[in-house]
């Protein structure tokens, strides 16, 4: 009985450590978005603002958070794709 309890507690610790890794990465992505500016020209102001926020997060983290923001990347990327988009 104690062996099963220890195994289940080890599984819980692993899941907690994974969630902590994602939270720390999301914090770094928010910090990196302050230094990177992204946007698209010729669009509505609302779409431009969303492009600046989401673009900074995606560029700052790269592929590390691809699994977390994959859905957001697909939706926003389709809306913001165009020749006048860029980051600096």
Curated annotation (Swiss-Prot):
One Pfam entry for this protein is: Coiled
What InterPro entries does this protein's entry cite? HssA/B-related (IPR008455)
Gene Ontology biological process terms in this record:
sorocarp development
Look up the domain of life of the source.
Answer: Eukaryota
Family per similarity comment = Belongs to the hssA/B family.
What protein name is recorded for this chain? HssA/B-like protein 11
Gene, per the UniProt record: hssl11
């Amino acid at each position: 009985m104690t062996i099963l309890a220890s195994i289940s507690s080890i599984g819980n610790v692993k899941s907690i450590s994974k969630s902590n890794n994602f939270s720390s990465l999301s914090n770094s992505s928010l910090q990196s978005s302050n230094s990177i500016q992204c946007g698209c020209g010729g669009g509505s102001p609302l779409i431009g603002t969303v492009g600046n926020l989401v673009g900074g997060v995606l560029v700052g983290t790269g592929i590390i958070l691809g699994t977390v923001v994959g859905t957001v990347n697909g939706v926003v990327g389709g809306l913001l794709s165009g020749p006048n988009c860029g980051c600096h």
